[in-house]
Structures are given as C-alpha cells and as structure tokens.
Curated annotation (Swiss-Prot):
It comes from Cryptococcus neoformans var. neoformans serotype D (strain JEC21 / ATCC MYA-565). Residues 278-379 are annotated as: Disordered. GO terms for molecular function: protein-cysteine S-palmitoyltransferase activity. The lineage of its organism: Eukaryota, Fungi, Dikarya, Basidiomycota, Agaricomycotina. It is found in: Endoplasmic reticulum membrane. Its EC number is 2.3.1.225. Residues 95-145 form the DHHC domain. Residues 331-356 have a biased composition (Basic and acidic residues). This is Palmitoyltransferase PFA4. The active site is at 125 (s-palmitoyl cysteine intermediate). Belongs to the DHHC palmitoyltransferase family. PFA4 subfamily. The gene is PFA4. Residues 286-299 have a biased composition (Pro residues). GO terms for cellular component: endoplasmic reticulum; endoplasmic reticulum membrane; Golgi apparatus. The keyword Lipoprotein applies. One of its GO terms (biological process) is protein targeting to membrane.
C-alpha cells in the first residue's frame, strides 16, 4: 500500500511539472508578449506548443495505465523444439523464477517493486509508477521523444522573449514576466537535459533491440568470454537497426511518433540467424559455469603444453584457485599446507585434479588475458597456500622464472619505504626472528614432478 501511495505521488508530481512548463509559459509569458490579442504570429507559437503538450500527456497516460505484460499462467518453454539443439550442459538452462514459481519466457524478468515477472522488462520507472516492458516500451520512448520536442520548442520561445527584452529595453517587462521567465528556465532546462540524455540512451537500446537489463547481461557475458569461462556467443535479438526499431515503434516509419499498439505476444522474438535458430532465445544469457550448483569437472588428463603452429591444447583448463578457496575453505593452517604440497607433488604443471573445491572450470578459448585471475583485494594469511595451486600462463606453460636476490633486496627496500606490515613480509632471516612467507617470492608455484627426489617437496 505504501509503495502504491508513493507511486501516486511521483505520477502527480510529474503531471504538475509538465502542466507548469506547458501552460505557465503561455499564460504569463507568451500571451502578454503578444498584447493579449489573437494573431497569426501568436498561433504559430501556441499551436505547435499545445500539440507537443497534448502528445506528451497522451503518451504519458499510456505509459502509466498500460501493463508491461505478465507471464501467462502455466507457460512453459517448448522443450520439444529444443531436442535437436546442441546445448552446453550447465551453462544453458531454461530460466525459472523462484519468487513467482514459474518459467520465465525469453527477455522476461522479475521486478522487486511490483513483485511480479514482466515480459521484456526494461526497468521500473518511478516517474510513471510502472515498469517499462513489452507492451508499453513504445509508449515510453514516444513519451521521451515528445518531451524532447516540446521542451526544445519551449526553450526557443523563452530565449526569443529574453532577446526581445534585451533589444527593446525601453519597454520594461513586468515583474510577473521576469519571475515566470526565471521559473520556466529553472524547470525546463533540467528536464530538457535529463530527458534528452535518457532519450538518447533508450533510442540507442531500441536500435540494438536491447533493454537496460539486457545491456547489463551483455556486459557480464563479455566478461565471461574474456576470462575464458564460456565460448563466444552472439546477442540473439539484434536483427538490424530498421527491423529493431520497427519491433518497438511499429511497422510504419511515418507513425513511429503516433501511439499504437505493440505487435506480438512478448513470449517469443525473432532471432538473428547468425546467433542460432529460434530456440537460442530460451538460453540467453549463458550462465557462469563456476557459479552453478554442480560445475563441470576438470579433466585430469589435460595437458597445458602448446600444440604445433603456435596453437594451444583445446582441453587446457585454466583455474582461479583464489576465488574457489575463498568460497569453500576460508582458512588453511600449516598442516593443510604440507598436505596440499603432497597432493600435487606427483602432478606436472599442466595436470589438475578433478576437484571442484580447489578450482573452477573455464573455457580454453583465446579470450583470456595473460593470467586468469580476479582482482579480489589483498591476500590474507589464511590464503597463503593459494600460491601453490597450479596456474597457467599463456605462452609459457610449465615454466617459471624465479625472482633472484636482486629482487629480494629491492623489495625489502620498498617494504621499508611504503611501510608494509610484517604480516606479509620477511622481516628477518629464518631462525633469527619473526618469519612469514611472501607468496609471490616462494618457489614452486608450478609443481614439477622430480624423479630423483621423490621424498622431497615439489619445486
């Protein structure tokens, strides 16, 4: 109930703001300027201004009262049509809403404000007290564009009035003229700037047949591809600028600014053939395999060494041990330290155990940077063992250049200069005082099997 009341406040405030800008300028600025008499010049100003105001109110009303489109009761994805589709297990699954307890059609999302799932949800807009979705997205974009047109024309009239006062300064304006000029500039300029930028953004989304939420999804998918978590995929709904705009504003370009009903049911959408067949839409966006309940296992037989022609082994599975250990084993003592080293002693640098608690799986495609790592903040003492987990470096698999004495001396000087804690440094040599390891200065971050020293630790 409280949310509904606040929604009415937002809508009422928006109506008052539009009315003030549209009518106060006509009554207190334009009408006195033309001597309070009907003339052709006056009509040239009032007719376009009132037409823009009418279209703003009309589209705003449609935005408020038009439902974005709810998910039909009992709707389920056409699983039978997906049998012939090759789908990567675990990273592509039909979408399901736990709050509403039903499957979600393509592009549908759950709104926490409305507490329901809407078709092709873009965002929840407090200014209209409604969500922007499939059935009212066109009304919303038209509303923004008409606000741009109306405020631009309004500002042109106000600027002309100011220039007239400056040119005919002997005709002193009344106090009401000055006050309402100031008020109109103070209200119209911020609206023109804010709505203008918002309009540019939503027109850009319409040209790409995307929504605000899908823009975030595409950024997330691009990050997963760059880190090698998933294979490269294409956004399936971009079918060309002209067709994209037609799908939102209607088939006739001459009526794009005229209110019209959205075509389609919002349950399925045309798909770009280069992205796959029509079933591709049921599996967008692909999920992060490392966040699934049962992530795919890591093959123990995979070798990291390069193939011929400067190619990499397609079975190579770089891991991110730091994130996996933080989520599963927050603290490791010295006994576990020695156990981990024994665990990996008989494995070469490219062989990794099939153990989900140690590492997460990622794709070996060429979208990784030099290191598959995440910037998660400082390394804490309980995470020192993460340096011993095998990690893969592109172009130099199985090799490590250990830092020499010059680096140790230089790093000691830098520690004193920047004031690092004893918790992560060598204050004194072993046996002479506090001794804590530096993970980045430890040998053996790549474990190599040594046949001559089978009883010793891996280097």
């Amino acid at each position: 109930m409280a949310a509904r009341n606040w929604s009415r406040v937002w809508v009422g405030g928006t109506v008052i703001l539009i009315s003030f800008i549209a009518f106060s300028s006509q009554i207190f600025v334009i009408w006195p300027w033309y001597g309070r008499e009907i003339s052709l010049d006056l009509l040239k100003l009032l007719v376009p201004l009132n037409l823009a105001a009418f279209m703003i109110f009309w589209n705003y009303r449609l935005c408020v009262i038009t439902s974005p489109g709810s998910v039909p009761e009992g709707w389920r994805p056409n699983i039978g049509a997906m049998d012939g589709m090759e789908v990567k297990k675990g990273t592509h699954t039909p979408r399901y809403c736990k709050n509403c307890e039903h499957y979600k059609p393509p592009r549908a999302h759950h709104c926490r404000q409305c507490k329901t799932c809407w078709l092709k949800l873009d965002h929840h807009c407090p200014w209209i007290g409604n969500c922007v979705g499939f059935y009212n997205q066109g009304h919303f974009i038209r509303f923004l564009l008409w606000v741009d047109i109306g405020t631009t024309f309004h500002l042109i009239i106000m600027v002309r009035r100011v220039l007239y006062i400056a040119e005919y300064y002997h005709q002193e304006p009344t106090l009401a003229d000055v006050l309402f000029l100031v008020f109109n500039f103070a209200t119209c300029v911020p609206v023109w700037l804010c709505v203008g930028m918002f309009s540019i953004y939503h027109v850009y989304l319409a040209c790409g047949n995307s929504t605000t939420i899908e823009g975030w999804e595409k950024d997330k998918v691009a990050t997963l591809i760059r880190r090698g978590k998933i294979k490269e995929v294409k956004y399936p709904y971009n079918i060309g600028i002209y067709k994209n705009i037609k799908s939102v504003l209607g088939p006739n370009p001459f009526l794009w600014l005229w209110p019209q009903k959205m075509q389609g049911d919002g349950l399925s959408f045309p798909v770009n053939p280069s992205a796959g067949d029509h079933t591709t839409q049921y599996f967008w966006p692909p999920q992060d395999p490392s966040r699934l309940p049962n992530p795919p296992p890591i093959p123990a037989h995979a070798s990291p060494f390069v193939y011929g022609n400067n190619g990499f082994n397609p079975n190579l599975q770089p891991t991110n041990s730091l994130r996996a250990r933080r989520s599963s084993t927050p603290h490791i003592d010295e006994d576990e330290h020695s156990h981990e080293r024994d665990q990996y002693r008989h494995y070469s640098s490219g062989e990794e155990r099939d153990n989900d608690s140690i590492s997460t799986s990622s794709s070996p495609k060429p979208y990784l940077s030099d290191y598959d790592h995440y910037d998660e903040g400082p390394m804490y003492p309980g995470e020192r063992m993460t340096a011993l987990i095998p990690r893969v470096r592109r172009g130099s698999e199985g090799w490590e250049v250990a830092p020499g004495g010059g680096w140790n001396a230089y790093s000691g000087m830098m520690d004193e200069e920047v004031g690092w804690d004893d918790e992560v440094g060598y204050d004194e040599a072993p046996g002479e005082g506090p001794y804590v390891e530096r993970p980045w200065e430890m040998r053996g971050r790549y474990n190599v099997y040594d046949t001559e020293e089978e009883s010793g630790y891996a280097h």
